[in-house]
Regions:
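Alpha-helical transmembrane segments of integral membrane proteins
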Residues: 2-3, 95-96, 100-128, 144, ...
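N-terminal signal-anchor/signal peptide hydrophobic helix marking the start
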Residues: 6-16
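Transmembrane helix irregularities
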Residues: 30, 139-142, 271
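Pore- or pathway-lining transmembrane helices of multi-pass membrane proteins that form conduits
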Residues: 129-155
Length: 334
């Protein structure tokens, strides 16, 4: 197990080098001048030259990339062009908001997707099965930005049930402990802030969870149907075990292996897909931060944010692989 983890961590190094090289190359091939965006169109040539010199933009591309890698080896992701703050500092400030949104969306996806998949598998070809799989197909095909706008129109503007944007109302005070607002409200016993934070996260979390819920439901149904056809399930039924024990004790545990793979991948997708959701709902997380960076050609933010999310995605996949042995002891890590 330990040797496997070490090998996977070593693979992380060339993967991140490849990601950084691709992102660096693509950013420098796109039109636009970060110095001009920073100073404005009326900036003098001398001022532009000074900014380019300070940012190292006058150097050849291979020199700029070498400077970036050298800083990266020291744990320095550089400074943002817009605010002049350290990229790592900005990530630490904004990542909890994205993580909180992604975790809530993942919880919704897991609960709803697995329940729908189990019921559809145990009631194959029933009306519920057809309707749930039709809903899953629609969910997979649904554009997130369109769904988010529809939710805002219905539940915020027309009905006034849910707040339209942000993480917390301006008139609600909350003592920050972890920067996860829901958790902070629980830790400090601030139930007014807890209610407000939950109220704010409902719409963006449901919007973000739509596609993963549909994918998890389809995968759970497919895996359950395959397991329910196995001989040991028929034997369990012949022994007189209750339907509940057959489904949840014997079938579900073996069906969860591909489902966990799907959930792990979807968690990574949620972190990336949060860009659209955060932009629509003005959620102050990494997604909106990176979107603004793309619009303003802030190289350091895009590179640092992409590397951070890529590292997280790889680590999530490693955790998913290790969970296989926990769920099914017959599987050994090779």
């Amino acid at each position: 197990m330990l040797a496997y983890i070490i090998r996977r961590m070593l693979i992380l190094i060339p993967t991140l080098i490849g990601v950084s090289l691709i992102v660096f190359t693509m950013l420098h091939l796109t039109p636009g001048d970060p110095a001009e965006l920073l100073l404005g169109e009326r900036a003098t040539d001398e001022a532009l030259h000074q900014v380019r010199e300070h940012l190292g933009l006058n150097e050849p591309l291979y020199v700029q990339y070498g400077m970036f890698v050298k800083r990266l080896m020291k744990g320095d992701l550089g400074e943002t062009i817009r605010t002049r703050q350290k990229v790592w500092t900005e990530i630490k400030q904004r990542f909890p908001a994205t993580m909180e949104l992604s975790l809530v969306a993942l919880m919704i996806s897991c609960v709803m997707g697995i329940i729908l998949g189990i019921i559809s598998a145990t009631k194959q070809y029933s009306i519920f099965d057809y309707l749930s799989m039709l809903g899953a197909l629609i969910g997979v095909s649904m554009p997130i930005f369109w769904l988010g706008l529809v939710f805002m129109l219905i539940f915020s503007l027309n009905l006034g049930w849910l707040p339209i944007s942000g993480r917390l109302s301006t008139d609600v005070d909350l003592s920050i402990v972890t920067n996860f607002y829901i958790l902070d409200a629980i830790l400090t016993g601030n139930w007014a802030a807890f209610k407000d934070a939950v109220w704010h996260i409902i719409m963006p979390a449901i919007t973000l969870s739509t596609i993963p819920t549909a994918i998890v439901a389809r995968m759970t149904r497919s895996a359950m149907l395959e397991v329910l056809r196995q001989d040991y399930i028929k034997t369990a039924k012949a022994k007189g075990l209750s339907r509940f024990k057959v489904v949840f004790k014997h079938a579900l545990r073996n069906a969860m292996i591909p489902v966990i793979t799907t959930i792990g991948l979807q968690f990574g997708v949620l972190l990336c897909g949060a860009i659209l959701t955060e932009t629509i709902f003005a959620w102050p997380g990494m997604g909106k931060w990176m979107y603004d960076a793309v619009m303003q050609r802030d190289y350091m933010v895009i590179q640092g944010g992409t590397l951070f999310i890529s590292t997280l995605f790889i680590l999530i996949n490693l955790v998913v692989d290790l969970l296989y042995a926990v769920i099914n002891p017959r599987i050994s890590v090779q």
